[in-house]
Amino acid sequence: MGIINTLNIEELKQQYRETGYVLVKNLLRDEVAQAAYEALKNRVPWEFHYREMNTGRVGVVNPADLERLTPREIKRLVPTMATLKDNDFSFAYCRYTIPSGAADCPEPVRILSDIFHYFNSDEYLGLLADITGDASGKEVSTWCSRYDRNHHLSVHMDESQSQTRIAAHVLALSKDWKQEWGGNFAFCNAESEPEIIVPPSFNSLMLFKVPRLHLVTQVESFVGESRYSLFGWYKVEKEYFHT
């Protein structure tokens, strides 16, 4: 099964070279994108992850406990969104770790493992090397995310002391998302104010050179839909993907 559509590599290379990022529309083949969306919406056993500013406390709520929590109880766990002026970092979103071994991946979410495998194929790593101009990448780490009401990812640079990250790699898989709902990706200026805002667009890949200031704005409290994505990094170290 083919995973992605044909890409205009020369055009993407030029844009990345000029701006430090590219937005690749319709990355996955239609049937693959639809299957991934269905898995994310209906099949994935989500965990809830959050980090409080000031205390730095990180919490994880497992899928069984998350199912038992009421919306009000979940809201109490969501921290206040940090800003650059706070000199701190906060987040709140649901996450699922894709097993790298297909045999370890339950059938209802097998399509996510298939995508993870393709992202780490020689073919795809070669495409990213061409686009970014950096062939040292050996892995595309990939997790699933779900942002619900009040969830956010505060301003940060994507720097890591333990990893050599070349580019952030985020594939949006939300349908009919509206910008006024929040949950928008944004590049920020030096004052941490959003200056380039990119609302989630189904089956669009955001690939950008790191480090770079960015965030995901808070999802508004009235929103009843979920924002889905596959996120990770094109990086040097091979840590998470094992065949």
Please report, for each region that a protein language model flagged, where it lies by residue.
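Fe(II)/2-oxoglutarate oxygenase catalytic core
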Residues: 1-205, 211-243
